[in-house]
Curated annotation (Swiss-Prot):
Protein name stated in the entry: Casparian strip membrane protein 2
Membrane topology of the entry: Multi-pass membrane protein
Keywords: Cell membrane, Cell wall biogenesis/degradation, Membrane, Transmembrane, Transmembrane helix
Purpose of the protein: Regulates membrane-cell wall junctions and localized cell wall deposition. Required for establishment of the Casparian strip membrane domain (CSD) and the subsequent formation of Casparian strips, a cell wall modification of the root endodermis that determines an apoplastic barrier between the intraorganismal apoplasm and the extraorganismal apoplasm and prevents lateral diffusion.
Similarity section: Belongs to the Casparian strip membrane proteins (CASP) family.
Biological classification of the source: Eukaryota, Viridiplantae, Streptophyta, Embryophyta, Tracheophyta
């Protein structure tokens, strides 16, 4: 009887030990990694997919300033063409007109008009300035906080607007006289005879005024993107 009790207790102990070990094994199994950590990693890695021009960098307006800086760069490249074309068009506008024989010739030359000479110089300076300003414009794209560079470009753009406006206005007055003449001064219009000269000078004036318009747009954009200082009043 006692032997059967002992074996029965051992049997119970074996089952109890088996249950204890199984519960211990289940409790000791390592827990899986939490799912929110993976989602946080994906959300953090998604910031690198944002385009460079739209990254805020801690300030809400930096992305907009970079986009305007890219537009500034493109407009400077676009303004280089009209200024260079205007200078070349006036410089190559000379025309000869033969009357009856080759011994009687009339010439229309740009250097006979001081306004056209000033026009060529001003547009050549503006074309060179557009090329030299491209690295500074690229610097404003890379760093939206380049306040000194933006201020320098704003001042130089304003000077170029004044220079080109004066040159284009003076040349436009000469082109008008060439087309219409002046009856009070007994100046006859010459465009009826010198068609090529008048076409080139008229096109050059239009191109120069187009460059003036582009520069004015650049000035407005620079004033808009210029950072403003905020004054905090002590309470």
């Amino acid at each position: 009887m006692s032997g059967s009790d002992t074996s029965g207790s051992v049997h119970v102990d074996e089952h109890g030990h088996g249950k204890a070990s199984s519960s211990y094994d289940g409790a000791g199994a390592p827990a899986p990694a939490p799912a929110p950590f993976q989602g946080h990693r994906k959300a953090g890695s998604g910031s690198s997919d944002v385009p460079f021009l739209l990254r805020s960098g801690g300030s809400g307006g930096d992305g907009l300033r970079r986009c305007l800086g890219l537009i500034d760069f493109v407009l400077r490249v676009a303004a280089f063409g009209p200024t260079l074309a205007a200078a070349i068009s006036i410089g190559t506008s000379d025309e000869r007109l033969s009357v009856f024989t080759n011994y009687f010739q009339f010439r229309a030359r740009f250097d006979d008009f001081p306004a056209f000479e000033f026009f060529i110089v001003a547009n050549a300076i503006a074309a060179g300035y557009m090329v030299l300003s491209l690295p500074f414009s690229a610097a404003t794209i890379m760093s939206s906080k380049a306040t000194g560079v933006k201020l320098l470009l704003l001042i130089c753009d304003t000077i170029m607007v004044g220079l080109l406006t004066a040159a284009a206005s003076a040349a436009a007055a000469m082109v008008y006289v060439a087309h219409e003449g002046n009856l009070r001064a007994n100046w006859v219009p010459i465009c009826l005879q010198f068609h090529g000269f008048c076409q080139r000078t008229s096109g050059a004036v239009i191109a120069s005024f187009l460059a003036v318009f582009v520069l004015m747009v650049l000035i407005v954009m620079a004033a808009f993107t210029m950072p403003r200082r905020t004054h905090h009043t002590a309470s």
